C-alpha cells in the first residue's frame, strides 16, 4: 500500500500538469493577495488617488463695478448672495435614462426651492399668459434667433418644414415649440403637472445653452434662502452636479428714478453672446451682462476680468482640492454726470404736477376735455391696477365675488349676442350695431389680424366687399365668409378637422375658434367691464373697496367704513387718493400720465438730470427676471419702459420760435427792431392760418421779435417763414427755399441729429415742408425733450452746442481715475451779434415775466412755452424750455408733459424745479407728496 502511494506521488511530480497547476496556484495566490491589498488594506488610499486624477478648470467671475452719480452717491452696486448651479456631469446608459434622471432631479430642486420661497431663473422666451396659454415673450429678430436655437440651426434662414413634426420650424407657434422641447428634446414625462413640466423645460433649455462648453455649470436660482442652501448641502450625495456657490446680485438704489438711465443686467442672450464674444472671447453663455442703459453701454468696463482655478473633483463633480487659482479683478466704477438729488426732486415734482392736472380735470366743468369719473373707474381695470383674474380665485373677497357674478351674467349675454351675429340668419351691418357691439367686433377682427389668422398682407384693399366692411354696410359674418373665399384666412392657425372641407365648414370652425378665444380673453373681458361700469352695473364703490381687498391701498378701517356707509362718495374718495398720489397718474394711464425733463449746466454742457416719468423698478428685472412684473411693464398703458426724455418725439410748438428768430435775424429778413403788424389772419398763403390771439378776440398789433416771443405771436413768425421763402419779398414764394433756411439754422442749433447721449435716443426731425407753418413749430417738426434741452442750452450760452454725455469718469476699484468724460462743443452758433442775441434773450425773459406762475419769483428766469396738438380728441402737449438766472445762466431746463392740456402746466413745473435748485422754497414743502394745485386746466392755445 505504501508503495502504491509512493508511486502515485512519483507519477504526479513527473506530470507536466503539476508545473501548470503550481504556476496557477501561485498566480492565483498573488492575485488574491493583491486584491486584498487593493480593496482592504489600501482601498481608501487608492480610491482617493483615483479620484484626484479628475482635473477640471473653471472660471471665476469678477465682481461688477458700481455706478455712481456725479457726487459719488451709489446708484448700482452688488450684494453678496448664494446661487444654485447645476452641471450635467452624470453617466447614463441611454438618452432616455438621462432625461428621466435629470428631469426628476430638477423637479425635486424646483419643489424644494418653491417650498422655501425661492424661484428658478426664467429667461426662457416663452411664458404662460393670463389665459393659461403659452406665448412668446420676444418678437422680430429675437424670436427668429430663439427659433433657430430651439431647432439647432445656425440661423433662422436654415429653418425648414419638418415632416416628422408636421410644420415649418420657422413658423412654429409657442405651443409647438413647447411640445417639441418637452417631448422630443427633453423627454419630460406626461406624469408631471403642466406647470412643473414648463419649469423643467426652462431649466433644461438653460442647461442646453451651455452644453457645448465643457465644465460650465448653469445657474438655475440666485439669491436663494438659507433653507435652500441647507437643502442642497444636506442632499449633496444624490444631487448630481448641483452646487451652492457664493455669488453677487445687482441692486439699485432709488430704482424708479434712474432705471431709464441705468437700465439693468441679466443673463446674456445668444445674440448678445455672438456680438460680444466677437470682440472678447472671455464671454460665456452663462454670463450676466448689461441689458439696457448704462449697464449695457459700459458693460465691458463694469465687467472686470475673470479669474480661474484648476482643481480636483470627485465622481460627483464636487471639488476636493484646488491646484491652481488666479483671482478675478473687480470691474471699474462708472460715475455719471447726473446729480442724484436733483434727479429725484425733478421726478417727484413732475409726478406731483401730472397728478395735479389729472385731479383738476376729473369731472371738471371748467375743462374742455374733462375726465369722466367712469373713465377713472375703468382705468383701474384697464391698466390692471385691479386684477380682474383674481375675482374668480378661491380666495376672492365678497366684493370681488359680487363683481364677478355681475360680469359672468353679462358675459353670457354678450357671448350669445356675438354668436347670433356670427351664425344667425339675419346678422346686422356693422354700422347699424350699437357702440358696445361695434367695440366687441372691432376687437375680434383686430385679434384675428394680430394672431395672423386674418392675413392683412393678403387683403385686397380695393376689394368691393372689403370696402363695404370698412364703411360699415355689411356684417362681420359677411366679411369673414368673404375673407375665407378670398383666402385671406389662414386656417392652419386654428384647429380644423378633416370634416371641415368646404368654406361653410371652415367658417364654422373659425366661429368656434373666435368664441373659445373671447370667452377667456382678458382684453375682451375688459370691454365688457367698460360698459358695465358706464351703466353703473359695476359701481365705483365696489371698485374702490376692491383696491383695499387686493392690497393696492394700505388697509384703513375708517376709510373702508366710510365707503361702505356712503359717508364718502367714490368720486371724492378717488380724487383724494389721486391728490395724495396714493394712486399715481402712471397707474391710471389717463391723459396725462407721462412726462420728461432735461436739466443742463449751460456753462459746461453737463447733464444734471434726465427724467422720464413713469419709471420702473429695475431691481425686479436684474439677476432673476420677475416674469410677471416684466409682463406687466410691457402691458402697462403708461409705458414705463419707454424713455420719454430721449425717445418720445412731438411737435415742439412755440418753443421752436427761437429757431425762427435766429434764422430771421441771421439772414437779415428781420432785425431786432423790425416791426410786423399782426392782422390775425395771414393772407399770404392759401390756407390762411390764424394767430391764436384772434380766437380770443384780439391781435398783437405792431410788434418786434422780442415782443413776438413774449406774446408767442404766430402771425409774426408766419411772416418770418414767408420772408425766408421769398428772400425778404425779393423773389416769388418758394417752399424749398424757405424750408432749407429753417433747416440750416435748426441744424446749427443742434436739432438735426441726436445729442450724443449714450442711451437710446430717437432721431430728431426738422420740418421738410411748409416753411410758414414750420416757423411756429408746426409742419412736421418732431423732437425729443433732450434735443430741446440741448437747443435751449445753446440759446442760453449764446451759441455753444454741446455733444452730450451721461458719463463723468471711470475709476478702478481702488478709486484711481482711468478715464474722464466731458461734453464737447459740437459747433458754435456764430451768426448773430450781441444785439441780436440780446433781442432773443429779452423776448424769453418777457415770456416768463408775463406768466402768472412766476409772479414774485426771486430768480430771474427766461423761457418759452409751447403747446402742440397731436389729436383733436386728446389734450394738447405742454412744453416749456428756459434757463436761469437770466443775467448769468447756470442751468437750462426742457420739459414736456404729453397731453398736459396747456403750456402753463409745464411752466409751473419748471418754476418748481428752479425753486428747488436755487433753494427758493424749502425742499420738504415742495416735495410734499401732494398733487400740484394746478391753476390752469383749459385745453387751449395761448402760445
Which residues make up each language-model segment?
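Hydrophobic "anchor" residues
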Residues: 74, 604-607, 801, 817
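Short, glycine/proline-biased beta-turn/loop segments that scaffold the active-site neighborhood
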Residues: 371, 611-613, 621-624, 650-706, ...
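Membrane-proximal periplasmic segments of bacterial cell-envelope enzymes
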Residues: 1-578, 585-596, 602, 615, ...
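Short active-site loop at a secondary-structure junction
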Residues: 332-338, 589-595, 628-656, 672-679, ...
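Active-site SXXK
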Residues: 34, 72, 106-108, 232, ...
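Active-site beta-strand/loop architecture of penicillin-binding DD-peptidases
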Residues: 65, 253, 259-273, 277, ...
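Mid-domain, small-residue-enriched loop/turn segments at the edges of structured enzyme/sensor domains
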Residues: 594, 689-695, 729-772
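Conserved catalytic neighborhood of penicillin-recognizing serine enzymes
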Residues: 332-333, 376, 380-430, 641-643, ...
